[in-house]
Amino acid sequence: MQLLKASDIISHLQIDGIFPGGNAIPCTHLNNYMNIKEKQLMNTIADVQSSRDLRNLPINQVGIKDLRFPITLQTAEGIQSTIARLTMTVYLPAEQKGTHMSRFVALMEQHAEALDFAQLRKLTTEMVALLDSRAGKISVSFPFFRKKTAPVSGIRSLLDYDVCLTGEIKDGAYGHSMKVMIPVTSLCPCSKEISQYGAHNQRSHVTVSLTADAEVGIEEVIDYVEAQASCQLYGLLKRPDEKYVTEKAYENPKFVEDMVRDVATSLIADKRIKSFVVESENFESIHNHSAYAYIAYP
């Protein structure tokens, strides 16, 4: 590969009429020159994606998956920074060979606003327009952290939750959904009933997926679930706290069936929520398998 000398660059600039002469090249002139040359180069490169496809098969979703990207979240408890994994896809008509993959990343690079449902709608709308499509979907998955206070000592610590926000444009309409996984403690009612002392308990993952007519906060979904668990989880506990959570779980036993039914009852009472799925997986401490339950509403 032959390297271009500074004198050669000056010569090209002089020939193109961008920089008339001299020994120093101002950055603005050089940037203008490079932008012009880049556009000229792009015009000479074949755009294969935009060529015609003859197989007559549309693609429901095509795009990028698992793009890791730093985001900020606008939540009820303030702005939070986190790292997201994004899947961004659009509908591709039968006659078009391919989509423009670089445009998905370019769109994310342009957005610095904190993410909430309003911003997700804006992002999805812009993506569909940018890709010249009639339908598109963006899923944003990220760890969400919440500061929790230990029940006795009052010590504060963070606990993480897995969240996925999805925005979709389909058939000319926009819709969004939210999925939150909340870790909790469950204690077996049967074990408590038949044992002279103690009962087996374990960590459980309760996952809520919902759609709503009005915005429902991530924190609200977490509160609904934690209120129905045998006990909440905490990032940091002292001995008095550990005693408290152990005894609270013992006094509030829940089967996996109880968990999904009680959470579902709370969600049904919230008139903003129009549909949901509740799942609970109990990582049984006395078995090498999990207990599982699922409710879909309506």
From Swiss-Prot:
It comes from the Bacteria. Keywords: Hydrolase. GO terms for biological process: tetrahydrofolate biosynthetic process. InterPro entries: GTP_cyclohydrolase_FolE2 (IPR022838), GTP_cyclohydrolase_FolE2/MptA (IPR003801). The record marks 188 as: May be catalytically important. Its EC number is 3.5.4.16. The keyword Phosphoprotein does not apply. It is an enzyme of class 3 (hydrolase). GO terms for molecular function: GTP cyclohydrolase activity; GTP cyclohydrolase I activity. Pathway: Cofactor biosynthesis; 7,8-dihydroneopterin triphosphate biosynthesis; 7,8-dihydroneopterin triphosphate from GTP: step 1/1. The keyword Hydrolase applies. It catalyses: GTP + H2O = 7,8-dihydroneopterin 3'-triphosphate + formate + H(+). Converts GTP to 7,8-dihydroneopterin triphosphate. Belongs to the GTP cyclohydrolase IV family. This is GTP cyclohydrolase FolE2. It comes from Neisseria meningitidis serogroup B (strain ATCC BAA-335 / MC58).
